Regions:
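Q-loop/switch helix immediately C-terminal to the Walker
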Residues: 84, 89-105
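Conserved structural motif at the start of ABC-family nucleotide-binding domains
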Residues: 3, 18-20
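Conserved ABC transporter NBD signature motif
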Residues: 57-69, 73-74
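The feature captures the beta-strand-to-loop junction immediately N-terminal to the Walker
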Residues: 34-36
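Helix-to-loop junction immediately C-terminal to a conserved catalytic motif
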Residues: 49
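Catalytic Walker B motif of ABC-type/P-loop ATPase nucleotide-binding domains
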Residues: 153-157
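Hydrophobic anchor residue at the start of the ABC signature
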Residues: 142
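Conserved ABC ATPase "signature" region
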Residues: 109-125
């Protein structure tokens, strides 16, 4: 998968959050957008996922054969883990994973039980998500990002709400997807992207 952004900008009321964004992103590479809080990292990631429309410029998703994807279909090819994305709290963990698998398969045809083991939450598999701690919810979000069989993975502030053990778990697994997928991060914590090949400051897009 290839993502191309050309002269992309996003404006809220009278303020440009990012502007003049030009990117050429490829599967097999990892990219981290860095900058202080409020600098536009999350906005840029949301633009690239299609969650929010650009005020100017164009973003294209291209298959390996060069075919351009319609924006309505981008979601099939990406997964996003972010603090502002909510899990369905009325589901148990088992129900949530089974629901997710209806829309996006897991790698190696992993089952819900495999997922629960991967995120180290087997004892909580029948617990409602609403009763999970913030750290447990973050593990679930990251687990879905790591295991979903899609070409593009977005991670926004990936160690948010994780303790030291959870951060080590993240670092152990994020490196396993680098090289085989297109990995895009938003972060101001160097430990979150120490593996990353391409570091891009959002201050360049002002």
């Amino acid at each position: 998968m290839q993502i191309i952004a050309q002269e992309v900008g996003k404006k809220f009321v009278a303020e440009w959050i990012v502007r003049g964004v030009g990117l050429d992103l490829h599967t097999g590479q990892s990219y981290t957008f860095v900058g202080p809080n409020g600098s536009g990292k999350s906005t840029l990631l949301q633009l690239l996922t299609g969650m929010v429309p650009a005020s100017e410029g164009t973003i294209k998703y291209l298959r390996p054969n060069g075919q351009e994807l319609e924006i309505d279909g981008w979601y099939k090819y990406l997964v996003l883990a972010a603090p502002y994305l909510e899990l369905i709290e009325e589901f148990t963990l088992r129900e949530l994973v089974d629901f997710h698998r209806k829309f996006k398969p897991l790698k190696n045809n992993a089952s819900a039980a495999d997922f629960e083991d991967f995120v180290q939450l087997v004892p909580a598999r029948y617990k409602l998500i609403r009763h999970f701690s913030s750290g447990m919810k973050q593990r679930v979000k990251l687990g879905l990002a790591f295991l979903s069989d899609v070409p593009v993975v977005f991670l926004d502030e990936p160690t948010s709400n994780l303790d030291a053990q959870g951060t080590r778990w993240y670092l152990d697994h994020v490196t396993s997807i680098v090289g085989s997928q297109l990995v895009l991060l938003g972060s101001n914590q160097p430990q979150e992207y120490e593996f990353c090949e391409n570091i891009i400051s959002v201050s360049a897009f002002k």
